[in-house]
Amino acid sequence: MSKGTRDRKNIYVSPEEMARQQRFIDEIKELNYRKEVKTGKKKLYCLNTFGCQMNEHDSEKLAGMLAEMGYAETDNVNESDLVIYNTCCVRENAELKVYGHLGMLKPLKNQKPDLVIAVCGCMMQQPEVVEHIKKTYSHVDLIFGTHNLYKFPELLYSAMDSQTTVVDVWDCDGQIAENVAIERKDGVKAWVTVMYGCNNFCTYCIVPYVRGRERSRSMDDILEEVRMLGRQGFKEITLLGQNVNSYGKDIGDGTSFAELIREVNKIPGIERIRFTTSHPKDLSDDLIYAMRDCEKVCEHLHLPFQAGSTRILKLMNRKYTKEDYINLVAKIKENIPDIALTTDIIVGFPGETEEDFSDTLDILEKVRFDNAYTFLYSKRTGTPAAKMEDQVPEEVKKERFQRLLETQNRISKEINDTFLGKVVEVLVEGVSKTNDKIFTGRTRGNKVVNFEADASLIGKLVNVRINTVKTWSLEGSIVR
């Protein structure tokens, strides 16, 4: 039995249930094969993903199951037999985009009645969203949430033969499903989920409500997946979780994320290890030492601080102060001097004053992040912050946001300037999206580097001398 699962059987989907889902996969594969024989064309799907890396990885699982069913992927919605939107509800803008896409699909559905339209992901965990879609977008065939992804074959089979919208959304925490097919595209980098859910309940965040409470995969299952990726030729893995630093706490046998990192570091074939996301309150000394001591762990840490004001951090329920965060960063830099730090920042949280915002700018100057993902505060229905008084006016948010961007852009460029003339190790990931003669990759510190190369170097580690620096990327030439 896998480590840590003895008392946690109920959080795993049973082998019998997974076998039952496989039968639906086989049924759909047979139907698609008959259609292919008749028409000479494979059935096509178009999968659109919104949101975080967890959603991206969920979409890889959907793609893996669809490949087993005999579908081929297309970017062209108009030629698709199946359209899926994997949704995000962290920001309002992502939700509005989904509604826009669904509205545009109605004429296509009228032209192609057999087209199956599916919507899944975090948005669907909100009952009011499901009701809105059923009422306003009745041409949608299938709605399911985050907790029953493994049931997609059964749900798709039902939707293909239903005259009404099939809805299957669970309000429980969900179970862990092992051995779901995964379609990873580039063959160089891979995401590996180590845990699901979040227990932190930050007052602005909808994630604990739509992803459930924390559930850790067993270490044995994770290590076996990473070993398989090493055998398949993947060079870099990113360990995923809403809060990876909490990994193992629910297992109850002392298993920790630092221990997992040390075990993953031993696996042959894997050259680089990354992880995301880390909560400052849970980042232990042991994890810092593991990052320092494990040669495959990249010198990059994404450590969201969200706001610089201790008063606002308390309102956010972040459970650390401004001083706590600065002291933690000092400890990290003491042990890993060349660490590249990135972060998340929310501007305009309810009650934020100019003095509070000045604390945010102060952290930028003191820590000097390589990059920051910055957001205007967005009300999320069902979160405590949405009900808070003293909401910050939009024009004030936008003015502060602009100052934040200007400050961070300057710091990012100043940091990148220090790379001019240096030789850096780069993992070659593929061809640039804008120039097929230019290849792109990342340093251990997660800097994007563009350079001339050839396809034979994809998946290889090369040394690149930096000749040009920009705010968000570097350019150079391979040192032969």
UniProtKB/Swiss-Prot annotation:
EC category name: transferase
EC number of this enzyme: 2.8.4.3
All residue ranges annotated as the MTTase N-terminal domain in the record: 43-161
Protein name (Swiss-Prot/TrEMBL): tRNA-2-methylthio-N(6)-dimethylallyladenosine synthase
Domain TRAM: 417-480
Domain Radical SAM core: residue ranges: 184-414
Cofactor: binding comment: Binds 2 [4Fe-4S] clusters. One cluster is coordinated with 3 cysteines and an exchangeable S-adenosyl-L-methionine.
Database matches in CDD domains: Radical_SAM (cd01335)
Binding positions ([4Fe-4S] cluster 1): 52, 88, 122
InterPro entries assigned to the protein according to its UniProt record, in alphabetical order: Elp3/MiaA/NifB-like_rSAM, Methylthiotransferase, Methylthiotransferase_CS, Methylthiotransferase_N, Methylthiotransferase_N_sf, MiaB_methiolase, rSAM, rSAM_horseshoe
Organism phylogeny: Bacteria, Bacillati, Bacillota, Clostridia, Eubacteriales
UniProt-listed Gene3D superfamilies: Methylthiotransferase, N-terminal domain, tm_1862 like domain
Domain of life assignment: Bacteria
Family statement: Belongs to the methylthiotransferase family. MiaB subfamily.
Cofactor: [4Fe-4S] cluster
Keywords, comma-separated and alphabetical: 4Fe-4S, Cytoplasm, Iron, Iron-sulfur, Metal-binding, S-adenosyl-L-methionine, Transferase, tRNA processing
Listed Pfam families: Radical_SAM (PF04055), TRAM (PF01938), UPF0004 (PF00919)
Subcellular location: Cytoplasm
A single GO molecular function term of this UniProt record: metal ion binding
Summary of subunit composition and partner proteins: Monomer.
SMART domains associated with the record: Elp3
GO annotation, cellular component aspect: cytosol
Catalysis performed (reactions): N(6)-dimethylallyladenosine(37) in tRNA + (sulfur carrier)-SH + AH2 + 2 S-adenosyl-L-methionine = 2-methylsulfanyl-N(6)-dimethylallyladenosine(37) in tRNA + (sulfur carrier)-H + 5'-deoxyadenosine + L-methionine + A + S-adenosyl-L-homocysteine + 2 H(+)
Organism: Acetivibrio thermocellus (strain ATCC 27405 / DSM 1237 / JCM 9322 / NBRC 103400 / NCIMB 10682 / NRRL B-4536 / VPI 7372) (Clostridium thermocellum)
Keyword Glycoprotein in annotation: no
Positions contributing to [4Fe-4S] cluster 2 binding: 198, 202, 205
Function description: Catalyzes the methylthiolation of N6-(dimethylallyl)adenosine (i(6)A), leading to the formation of 2-methylthio-N6-(dimethylallyl)adenosine (ms(2)i(6)A) at position 37 in tRNAs that read codons beginning with uridine.
Designated gene of the protein: miaB
